[in-house]
Amino acid sequence: MELGKGKLLRSGLNALYQAIHPVHGLAWTDGRQVVLTALHHNNEEPKFGNSIVVGQFEHVHGLYWGPFLGNDTPALLAVQHKKHVTVWQLCYSSLDKNKLVVSQTCEIGDPFPVLPQGCTWHPSKDILVVLTKRDVSVLYAVRYENTSIKADVKSSGLIHCACWTKDGSRLVVAIGSALHSYIWDSKQKSLNACAFCPVFDIGGYICAIESTVDSQVAVSTELPLDRICALNAGIAFDVPASSEITISSQPGLLLMEEEFSMDVVQKSADSGSLTTDSLATSPATLDLTHIVNHSKADLNSLLNMKKKDYLTGSGQDSSHLILVNFEKKVTTTRRVSIPGILVPDILAFDPTAHIVAVASNTCSAVLVYSLTSSSVPNIQQILLEKNERPKGLCFLTDKMLLVLVGRQKTSDPAFLPSSSSDKYLIRLMVKEVMFDEDSSASSGGNTSVQASFDSSMSIQDKKKLVESLYKEGQSAHREILLPGGVAPPTYLRKKKLIEEIRSYDGDQSPTSSANEFDDKRSKLRVESLDTEPKNRSITLGLDMDKKPNSRPTSPKSECQKSSPPNFIKHGEMSPQQEILSISRNVERLCCNFAHLQQHLSELTDITRNGKRPLSASYLPCRQAPYVTVVCQDAYHPEGPAMKRSILLCDNKLRLGTIQELFGLSLIEMQLGPSLWIILTGDSEGFIPLTFLANQEITIRDARISTTHPPLSMDRNNSLQPSSSVT
């Protein structure tokens, strides 16, 4: 179902969270309007009915239905804006059953913006939690007043998301990498920190949280990018010891060295415990986290790629889905790696089939996991188009998943987004959940392998099983190992995990990327390897060889291949030549900056006027409009003055042009017989005045005229205009 154009948040949003009401249907927004769409489904294909607009605001970031308490109780709808949340009551008129009556019941505001997933309702009571990055507010009387209380958040970190447990006894707030647990006291109307485990660290930055069954929650953690996106390539990879380095006699090849390790990582936080029990790696996969960083002299040497399994990974090399139980003591019951999704900020759970859907606002894939097995297998992958992003997930039934899809316009990756929201073409899509065991084989490895790694197996049994699988899979084709030790699904094997913004110089060939490896070969060729980052900045005559710059150049360098910069050699040039070269380079940079300002000015005109200025409106050269600028000597106004003719631009003058022409930083212009004004510039650099063609204006140095008046003249006389002024 197509919903049209809409403006939604870029990240951290699940637009279908608490968005379906059994009576009023689906609540959705295009960024301004609140729309209700009828939804009919009885374990069959869902059917969407008519849509009505019940409200319109300046900004709408999210809609959340309150708990369904019966047909006789009016429904509550929370509308999330930028820095406040309004709660509305909806019911049908007693006189006209088809007339919907909407009225506001309460409102809460905060100095900080509301988080993208900033509201969550109690599962069985009219209690609304509103989240900002610093505060957790609880509105417990939303039908009558704005009364609220705030939780005592003792952490200095930033709040990201929160949810109530399914039984409604506990509010779990995600702050950084820790879960803060609060107990709701309905009599005292207060949130109290959990007595036995108020804070539980799970070892990864939390992206999303969703209640599952009873007092259990599902948590997704993001891939820590600081491990793979470091400034120095040596920081981005784990380098093995020197004794493990093997050099091949054939240059240009990569050797694969098989090595398996088995570790059990246990981590405790407060009174809770965290036991990591990850999945097995699929056979014959390559671990790219052990590339040896050779020196520049060893460019012809070979790189060693270690073979490693992640039966019990540390949780620092992948995004994860974690199940946390809050019954008697906090325990992490299950943990699974999420392949191919860096920031899994969308979670949806179905209590009937015990399945979890995981997605990201920045990735076009949706993964479905089953919680019935201790291995938490991936049973289905849903792949959207390249320019489509999931903006919301929810289960209609145990076999139907509703996906809100946002299609983006193709944008230039060289420009980073400047706002937290973006425009999308929105549509609703229903996907059937497949429970076929064969469908889970492509989830990143052998399903039987994953199901075999039950927590009841001993470490020795696991090691024997992995070794046997490895021996059987030696002849199989090799694949690139995704972070977390899980092989990529079929739809991700030939795609990049991270799309990098690269700009290559004319003398540098791009380094081979992960998707260029042929998975049918056991020996992989690398076109070019350079372990030391090259300095791509424009040389200004400084000794920058000692400190290379690894930052990428701007796209403008792509156009300068024909004229590479002249690198200065200190031993061949005199100091005067070096200074001259530096000044020329500085002038070139200033010129480029001036062109950039001009382009920005054109973009501003396009944004304001909706069209590009036409060059056809330019006048012929013989009819060039210009003004004559007379620069008066402040000490001798009656003496000779400098005159320059300057071309007008739409009857406007650039202040910077006059400043550069006469060497003045602060300029005064004569406006009347006894009035001088100091000139300023607007956002585009123009003097905020219009001039006529062939007009003559008089200016002078404002600093000298105001601070040092001429001694031989009367102050009033110094303000008299020159006789040459017309």
Swiss-Prot record:
Annotated spans, Disordered: 503-571
Keyword Transmembrane helix in record: no
Annotated SUPFAM superfamilies: 3-carboxy-cis,cis-mucoante lactonizing enzyme
Biased composition (Polar residues): 506-515, 550-565
Keywords in alphabetical order: Coiled coil, Repeat, WD repeat
WD repeat segments: 55-98, 154-194
InterPro entries: WDCP
Basic and acidic residues bias: start-end ranges: 517-535
Pfam families listed in its UniProt record: WDCP
Coiled-coil annotated spans: 581-609
PANTHER family: WD REPEAT AND COILED-COIL-CONTAINING PROTEIN (PTHR14897:SF12)
Protein name (Swiss-Prot/TrEMBL): WD repeat and coiled-coil-containing protein
Gene name of this polypeptide: wdcp
